[in-house]
């Protein structure tokens, strides 16, 4: 795939998606203050973001409501308390995990909802169920995207088949390249993005990227993908997200050349909310343990536990992670 634009060029097809509440919610069990959420919404509108992901549409039969904040479930009334009828250009989205969302019960018709987009997330082994969910949501009137998770552990043949099935049989408008473990390097991202774009363009779809920062490559991987034609770019304020976090909103807003995007509202939000959140002890961001799991292409759950235990025995951890019996 040829490069699509230069670093200083303007790309009208680019869409910036703020995932702070959803991916960041994995850090603090979605316990955000009303002021935080309302100010985040206002900041995204002012910054020119295209989409704000409010959280998960998780099943209350699968997850105990008392264990999480409201953005784990994203009830319609809770979103409307923040956005009203959302008379802005910012679109509202939620994520629905295959097998963890009672989608036929909890996803109401678009005509009754302020939500614009459902972001379905699946693993390679649940593609048929994902297609069913995608098409159901599309038939209810929503825009739908699909995140294929943990692709760094899938075989080339599995990924090729998954992409073809999703592109040909689902009504998703965007297929996301997801670096779940933060293990991929820019050269790999370029090759994968090329693969995704070729399939997507054949079926009239777009491609997005959701990067993790285990090896401090989330921003680099995002702009690498963007350069060759990926258009939906996921970010979070100060990179807030599970484990090592994600691509920083501040970095991407400083990079993009589209005059509709403004960095000042992002910086003001970071100053008001993200700095105090860090000082209050909410932990995320790249650290040695996350680098180790990313380098080993492993889920960060062990690094998250390492962090929670206050450990600093990095060499022992590295030996544990890389030992094969």
What do the predicted segments below correspond to?
Residues 1-325:
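Catalytic cores and adjacent flexible loops of soluble metabolic enzymes
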